[in-house]
From Swiss-Prot:
This is PAK4-inhibitor inka2. It comes from Xenopus laevis. Belongs to the INKA family. Inhibitor of the serine/threonine-protein kinase pak4/pak5. Acts by binding pak4/pak5 in a substrate-like manner, inhibiting the protein kinase activity. One of its GO terms (molecular function) is protein kinase binding. It is found in: Nucleus. The lineage of its organism: Eukaryota, Metazoa, Chordata, Craniata, Vertebrata.
Length: 316
């Protein structure tokens, strides 16, 4: 039985194998045909141009010229800062940039703010092909005595007025207050100007505030000489300070004492005495001695207010 079944399947398998061989041969023919087409396409295409094969060369970018920027910065620094100078190379004549020379003044200028080092880092040097001389900015070490002694305007070489520093302005302002103290009341100077630039607020301790602000004021030349001579004096202040108080301070002291007196008088006066501050109680609980003390206290009372007893009014 199995043999008969295998005999029936064998021709079917042969036919399948023949079909597979035929399909494989057709696939081989198709592959050969495709290879021929590709070779023909290569032969028919034009040869590649030599320009395409070369890589694209990007031209180098040159740094922008910064002559104007350097000149603007040096001019701004000459007007803003007062403790700088310019250091030029040896091949550059000093006449070209000499007019931009920066002169010193006393103190620390608010406009400069110590920004020279940051600006030096920002300046990019140009290439050697341009041959443009670079300007190097450096700060001159100014002696402390020169910085502290100068107090006026310093004129530059071009005749322009130099800006004052904050220390010079404050020094001149307080010197003017100290010199004009003879003609002007010092309390007016305190109320209008103070070292902290803050309005003077007078509170409960207004006298202490005035004294503290007065101690901060600069002294006159005569007072400074007296302070040097009398070095052991308490706080180096004149002896007649407490005696020569202005009328303004005296008026404020009088107002303070008057307010305290009015607060004391604001306490309500009782028409009858407090009977020795004894606690209030009913009348029939008190003894005869307490009633006698109450009558004596009423006799010594100076009030003229009516006392109503048994529906009858009378005055002591």
């Amino acid at each position: 039985m199995h043999k008969s079944h295998l005999d029936s399947v064998a021709p079917q398998l042969r036919s399948d194998l023949q079909c597979i061989k035929a399909s494989s041969s057709s696939l081989c023919d198709q592959m050969e045909c495709m290879l021929r087409v590709l070779q023909d396409f290569k032969r028919s295409s034009p040869p590649p141009s030599p320009d395409i094969e070369k890589p694209c060369v990007v031209p180098p970018r040159r740094a922008p010229r910064r002559d104007n920027r350097i000149s603007h910065r040096t001019s701004d620094l000459s007007e803003a800062d007062s403790a700088c100078c310019m250091d030029l190379p040896s091949d550059v004549s000093p006449g070209s940039c000499g007019q931009r020379g920066l002169e010193w003044d006393s103190g620390y200028s608010e406009v400069s703010g110590g920004s020279l080092r940051g600006e030096e880092d920002d300046i990019v040097e140009e290439e050697s092909e341009t041959s443009v001389p670079t300007v190097v900015l450096r700060r001159l070490p100014t002696p402390s005595c020169q910085r502290l002694s100068s107090g006026g305007f310093l004129n530059s070489r071009q005749g322009r007025i130099r800006p004052k520093s904050t220390s010079d302005v404050c020094l001149e302002q307080w010197r003017g207050i100290g010199l004009g103290s003879d003609s002007q009341d010092w309390t007016g100077c305190l109320l209008s100007q103070s070292r902290s630039r803050q309005p003077l607020v007078l509170g409960d301790n207004s006298f202490a505030d005035l004294v503290k602000q007065w101690m901060d004021l600069p002294e006159n030349v005569d007072e400074e000489g007296r302070r040097v001579r009398d070095g052991g004096r308490w706080l180096h202040k004149p002896h007649g300070f407490l005696i020569s108080l202005s009328g303004n301070v005296k008026r404020r002291l009088g107002n303070m004492s008057r307010l305290r007196r009015s607060e004391q008088e604001a306490v309500k006066r009782m028409s009858c005495p407090q009977l020795g501050c004894r606690p209030l109680s009913l009348y029939y609980h008190q003894s005869l001695s307490d009633i006698a003390e109450a009558s004596t206290n009423l006799l010594h009372c100076r009030s003229r207010q009516p006392i109503i007893c048994n529906e009858g009014a009378g005055f002591l």
